Amino acid sequence: MELLAGTGLWPMAIFTVIFILLVDLMHRRQRWTSRYPPGPVPWPVLGNLLQVDLCNMPYSMYKLQNRYGDVFSLQMGWKPVVVINGLKAVQELLVTCGEDTADRPEMPIFQHIGYGHKAKGVVLAPYGPEWREQRRFSVSTLRNFGVGKKSLEQWVTDEASHLCDALTAEAGRPLDPYTLLNKAVCNVIASLIYARRFDYGDPDFIKVLKILKESMGEQTGLFPEVLNMFPVLLRIPGLADKVFPGQKTFLTMVDNLVTEHKKTWDPDQPPRDLTDAFLAEIEKAKGNPESSFNDANLRLVVNDLFGAGMVTTSITLTWALLLMILHPDVQCRVQQEIDEVIGQVRHPEMADQAHMPFTNAVIHEVQRFADIVPMNLPHKTSRDIEVQGFLIPKGTTLIPNLSSVLKDETVWEKPLRFHPEHFLDAQGNFVKHEAFMPFSAGRRACLGEPLARMELFLFFTCLLQRFSFSVPTGQPRPSDYGVFAFLLSPSPYQLCAFKR
């Protein structure tokens, strides 16, 4: 009765506050060690959550690096986080300590889309047997279906022709290039996963791309981070569907495509694509409870490959065309090299890359300047490690700040400017820099890197072979500042394509 009347509430409230503060202190205990990385003082319960701009993480990390150094700590709720900055520290973390930093932290927000036991995809899977199994399968299967080979090169070149035809239809008129670039790159991934291409005007195709674009921004910001810190909130009925509608819709589309694919799959015939190869592995794994080959994991692996192999490449190409209209002198030099090495009739080939140092340098500089994955995906320590003299305990979430490497002022001559000469020596020969790390490094380096390199070179050279690009007449010069939503995309802009 006292409790109901309110007279017993004060002792309970005091007890609850003391309990929460004790739990909070327990989670802070590692900060008391002398060799733990410095960082801003966390607030009770929330930690540094409100002291970091989650909508502009690269800038927040830049300011914190300037204040606390290349290795600093944060407390996100009760989760300890260490951010690693600069070439030397990131190399030490991902390469020297690679075996002990290849794990992933738990991210409860992904459980709502089917991540669970033996179903964690490949990108976010914990470091262990399941990850190795799926990584090995993905790399070998992509290689078998042409990644790095002439067969896929021809497919990319053919898709580039479709892209150029679509641009020809819009020649001279202002357009946002991202949509067309996204369609072209998606068709390359679709050829590997589903052995098919989509017509650019297909309404279902347009819907898939729209949903995928929307879903990419659902994973960043304050609310997803709060849900990761306090996953009990995900038990609120309907909350996940409201917070992550794009991801759930996209995965439903993936399920429908897989269901259609199963109707025509013949296990007695060689696999047509990655989906067939995965279905064959599911058949082999029947009766093996330890296998990660199952229907639930198929949808997640396909989702990972779309994200890793499509969105990043199309955004990079969108940056490339933006930088060409902002730097017409660079565009002219690339076209001059294309004319000298390839001409205007023959299709570009990967073999041409070795003879085109300036074009190669421009593509690399686009990747460095665009910096589209500034914060990388989080890692986790599987045991106590030491980085740059600081002790980082087992179980700590790690954020390798790739932006701090690609814009490292101690490494690059003009880190904040678009400067292709970063990748050229005094004689004009192409040189690759050790600080060029857009695909990350170590055991968790992007598995789609070989495919991305092929697509970037072939699409970029095909486009500049056929067209000149410029800012539309009467429109202001577009900005080269990016918009952060986990990936760093260029601010929306328009260009005009003119046939050469």
From Swiss-Prot:
InterPro entries: Cyt_P450, Cyt_P450_CS, Cyt_P450_E_grp-I, Cyt_P450_E_grp-I_CYP2D-like, Cyt_P450_sf, Cytochrome_P450_fam2
Names of required cofactors: heme
SUPFAM superfamilies: Cytochrome P450
Membrane topology: Peripheral membrane protein
PROSITE patterns: CYTOCHROME_P450
Binding, heme: 446
Enzyme class: oxidoreductase
Localization terms from the record: Endoplasmic reticulum membrane; Microsome membrane
Keywords linked to the UniProt accession: Endoplasmic reticulum, Heme, Iron, Membrane, Metal-binding, Microsome, Monooxygenase, Oxidoreductase
Record PANTHER family: CYTOCHROME P450 2D26, CYTOCHROME P450 508A4-RELATED
UniProt similarity note: Belongs to the cytochrome P450 family.
Protein role: Cytochromes P450 are a group of heme-thiolate monooxygenases. In liver microsomes, this enzyme is involved in an NADPH-dependent electron transport pathway. It oxidizes a variety of structurally unrelated compounds, including steroids, fatty acids, and xenobiotics.
Identification of the protein by name: Cytochrome P450 2D3
Protein's organism: Rattus norvegicus (Rat)
Underlying gene: Cyp2d3
